Amino acid sequence: MKNLIVYYSYEGNCNEISNAIKGVINADVLRLVPKKEKITKSLFRFVWGGVQVYMTKKPELEPYKIDLSQYDNIFIGSPVCFGTYAPPINTFLSENKMKNKNIAIFICSGNNKRNTYKNFEEALKGNKIVDKIEFVYPIKNGIEEAKYRAEQWAIDCINKIN
């Protein structure tokens, strides 16, 4: 069974968690990168993110090549953006219809996941959600502990599948 980690990272949190997961399972990694992204530390990022989410935007992504039929287990990671997964994940899920996959979801949030898991489950109908985990401000609140949790969680997910 082949493993894939697909993630989007805005501030680096999901990147750190993805790297931790990759460190303990044999997985290919696909980092989603929007062609036009407004990276900023100002409050404008909330305006940009809010507009993207509420208008259900699907930003164009940098080209990637991935054949999802080659993977049985897919770990999907996203920051929480206005109570749901980030718009680049929306693009990926709309462009790549998955069925009969084992899916593990990791999110990085500011402690307000609201409908994120529910929205993932709706977008991923026809797949098995193996497990879900949330990391609250992992870089800010202690990245080493978050990485350890991610590693243990990834191992548990693989054990549940096997």
Whereabouts are the PLM-identified features?
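Redox-cofactor binding/interface segments in oxidoreductases and associated redox assembly factors
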Residues: 76-77, 105
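"Short basic amphipathic alpha-helical interaction patches in structured regions
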Residues: 89-93, 118-121
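N-terminal beta1-alpha1-beta2 submodule of the flavodoxin-like/Rossmannoid cofactor-binding fold
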Residues: 1-76, 83-84, 90, 94, ...
